[in-house]
Amino acid sequence: MNDETTPANKNPEKAELRCGWTTGACATAATKAALTALITGEFPDPVGIILPKGEVPYFQLAYEGLGEGYAMAGIVKDAGDDPDVTHGATIISTVYPAPPGTGIIFRAGEGVGTVTREGLAIPPGEAAINPVPRRMMTEICEAICAEYGLPADLVITISVPGGEEIAQKTWNPRLGIIGGISILGTTGVVHPFSCSAWIHSIHRGIDVARAAGQKHVLGATGSTSEDAAQALYNLPDFAILDMGDFAGGVLKYLREHPIDRLTIAGGFAKLTKLAQGALDLHSSRSQVDKGFLWQIAERAGAPADMKERILLANTAMEVLELTQSIGIDIAGPIALEARQTALKTLRGAPVEVEIIVTDRKGNILARV
C-alpha cells in the first residue's frame, strides 16, 4: 500500500494549497484503531485506511483509551488549507461489543448531532453520521472482525469535544440536526475552498423544507438581505437556505425538486450579476458589467452624459448612487432581469419566484 499522508491536489490553479481529510475519514481511522485495540490490546499508530477512490492515508492517533470491554481512539482533523470550521477538532471513536446478531450500531456521542427532521439522508433519531462514513466504518469493522473470526456486532459512538459549539457555525441548526456537528464526506478528501460542500448543504436544506411541507423558501446572498426578507415573512429556520453566492445551486436543484415559492434576496451588486445571467455570484467568478448597467440606466431614462460616469464607476453601488441622485430607479429593472434569469434556469418548474434587492443597510430597493 502507498503511504499517502497528504491527498493529491489535482487542481493546477491551486497547486500550492494542501488538501485535508473529512470528519468521516477521521472517524473511520479512529474506529479502526479502537476496534483493533479492543481485539488485540494494541493500537495501530499510525493507522491507515482505504478511501472510496483508493487513496490510502495514514493518521496519527491523538488519543488512546482501553478499558474493560471498550476501546477509544481519537484523531485530530486536518482540513489542509481549507477554512473548515472542524479543522483541529478531535474525532473520537469508542467501540464496544453489542449483543449477538445486532450488527453495527452507530451512536452520537458528545459534540455529534442527532437528526430531528425528515428529508436528510439519515432518518430522525439517528446520529448525524452520513451514509458514506457509515459504510466506510462498517466495511472496515467487518473486515477486521472477519480476520479474527469474530462477529461484527458492535456499538460505535463518535464524539467530538466542542462539537456543539462548532455546529453553531454550520448549517446543522437550520437543518434540524441538534447537539453537534455531522460526520461527513463522500470521498474522504477535503479540497481547499471547494464549492461542493456548500452546494450540498443547500440541497439538503431544500430536502428538509420539502419533507416538512414548507411551501415558501428564502435564499439570500448574505445576512443583511436575509434579515430584510425575514422582516417581511418570518419564515422558520429550516425554510432559509444558505444560498450565499450559489444562486445556481438553489435554482438547479429546485428545477428537479420544486417548492411552490422561492424568494431570492440580495444586495444590488450580487443581483446585478444574476440579472446579467451569472449563477455563481462570487467576485472571483463573475463581475458586474458596467455596460449592462448603463443599458439598464438608459432605458430607465438616464441622460446620455451619464454614460461615461457609469462606465468608469468603481463599483455597482457607485452606479446605483449616481442614478439615485437624479431620481432614476435601476434597482427595479435589475430585479426584473434577475427574476428572468431565475425563471430561465428553472426551465418551467412550478416555482413562483420573487426577487428582493437591498442596499448595504438592508433597505429594500426593489421587490418583484
UniProtKB/Swiss-Prot annotation:
Enzyme class label: transferase
Catalysed reactions listed for this entry: Co-precorrin-5B + S-adenosyl-L-methionine = Co-precorrin-6A + S-adenosyl-L-homocysteine
UniProt pathway: Cofactor biosynthesis; adenosylcobalamin biosynthesis; cob(II)yrinate a,c-diamide from sirohydrochlorin (anaerobic route): step 6/10
Keyword S-adenosyl-L-methionine: yes
InterPro entries for this protein: CbiD, CbiD_sf
Native source organism of the sequence: Brucella canis (strain ATCC 23365 / NCTC 10854 / RM-666)
EC code(s) of this entry: 2.1.1.195
Name of the protein described by the UniProt record: Cobalt-precorrin-5B C(1)-methyltransferase
Gene: cbiD
Disulfide bonds: none
Keyword Transmembrane belongs to the record: no
Pfam families for this protein: CbiD (PF01888)
GO BP terms, alphabetized: anaerobic cobalamin biosynthetic process; methylation
